[in-house]
Swiss-Prot record:
This is CTP synthase. Disulfide bonds: none annotated. Pathway: Pyrimidine metabolism; CTP biosynthesis via de novo pathway; CTP from UDP: step 2/2. It catalyses: UTP + L-glutamine + ATP + H2O = CTP + L-glutamate + ADP + phosphate + 2 H(+); L-glutamine + H2O = L-glutamate + NH4(+); UTP + NH4(+) + ATP = CTP + ADP + phosphate + 2 H(+). One of its GO terms (cellular component) is cytosol. It comes from Bacillus cereus (strain 03BB102). Keywords: ATP-binding, Glutamine amidotransferase, Ligase, Magnesium, Metal-binding, Nucleotide-binding, Pyrimidine biosynthesis. Allosterically activated by GTP, when glutamine is the substrate; GTP has no effect on the reaction when ammonia is the substrate. The allosteric effector GTP functions by stabilizing the protein conformation that binds the tetrahedral intermediate(s) formed during glutamine hydrolysis. Inhibited by the product CTP, via allosteric rather than competitive inhibition. One of its GO terms (molecular function) is glutaminase activity. CDD domains: CTPS_N, GATase1_CTP_Synthase.
Amino acid sequence: MTKYIFVTGGVVSSLGKGITAASLGRLLKNRGLNVTIQKFDPYINVDPGTMSPYQHGEVFVTDDGAETDLDLGHYERFIDINLNKYSNVTTGKIYSSVLQKERRGEYLGGTVQVIPHITNEIKERVYRSGRETNADVVITEIGGTVGDIESLPFLEAIRQIKSDIGRDNVMYIHCTLIPYLKAAGEMKTKPTQHSVKELRSLGIQPNIIVVRTEMPVSQDMKDKLALFCDIDTKAVIEARDADTLYAVPLSLQEQNMDQIVCDHLKLDNPAADMTEWTALVEKVRNLSKKTKIALVGKYVELQDAYISVVEALRHAGYSFDTDVEVKWVNAEHVTAENVQELVGDTDGILVPGGFGDRGVEGKIVAIQYARENKVPFLGICLGMQLASIEFARNVLGLEGANSSEINPDTPYAIIDLLPEQKDVEDLGGTLRLGLYPCKLSEETNAYNAYNEPVVYERHRHRYEFNNQFRPDMEKEGFVFSGTSPDGRLVEIIELKDHPWFVAAQFHPELVSRPNRPQPLFHDFVKASITNKESK
């Protein structure tokens, strides 16, 4: 029978519930269990697809095209599984589904209420995740903080699941904070006690408490927490700030967290073999070289907006024993006059995805700098579109060339809507989303990176390269090295007379893993290191 683990958070948000859930998932997977994981977000948006990155951070896209929470990126990178649309559920999705059922008459004229209709829908999403993946263990992270009004239906639903399927099949893990008061020179357990009290008042008794802390937690403090929160002392797990995220699973294993979980859920599996993971962490902690990459974006104040890009750069660096330092460059501040000052000290330039016109001209200036100065360049999504526009303007001499997204009246729409997108008015869920094939041309940087004729990558965009400009750009050394299998859609572009200048319409960062870097990132970082060494 499938087992269910629920991870909740208390005291404050951003405690690392997602990393805790992902780390536990890795440990259980390494015990030979089939693990899946999901995130429940209490906000009323149907998905984060139309939310500002300043509000939410990155939108992570799954193979099947779901626009999801950035925590799913952590889950995929840690557990090394590909998640699906069932892995991220929002209040908006739940209510939308219930209201559609009500309109279809599925409730037989009954009064539709939070209990049982909303809670039943939530429970069904939990069970469905296990069914669809045939999982031994389903880990579900409940977003938000215990005490938030938005989380109440989710907490009630997970309380009911224990009654439905029995205590041996359900486990509750509560993540809290033990703050350190500098003036008093001591740590305080009271916020954790109150958070657990709040959770218990809702009918949920946590089986494990994971305490986030800056300082070591003494045995006396663990005993105190165990007493007040009614759990075993060994089930108080310390989650101290780590020098690398990938060290967290090892820290949890040292404290026997996965064994406590298996004992409670009556899972008789051998201990997790973390030899490879330990070697990875040792490598990460002892990188001997450095390279600096300029990330030219418009959301640089909130680095979570580019979290998968940064992780993919790091993963690529690990292959070369290199610590990749990201220099954050606000695209709105980049001009032809200061671009040398802003990116001149870096070994490679990356322009990530984005929407809208803010910061576009600064990105184009940075791309021109990379092209003219032979600096390794990687463009992603909008970065690929702007690389095409920069080339059209400055090499073909097409003054005013642009994307019809940015300037609908441009005389040269290098980037334009697909014909089937022209009449679409809704913004949510109407992009080209998810995994699509890309056919590569031999003897190109893209082919050399992948070493395969056809690759599959995840997309999130609406606008495409306008094929009427292809012949003229090819004549000038612009290479279309990756296309859709029918050749209609441009997927990857690069430059002939440049050490390494590649840009992709898809989002390669989404499939990178710490032990298996994404090929374009791998070769981009390699080219950046070569550039540094040649200076």
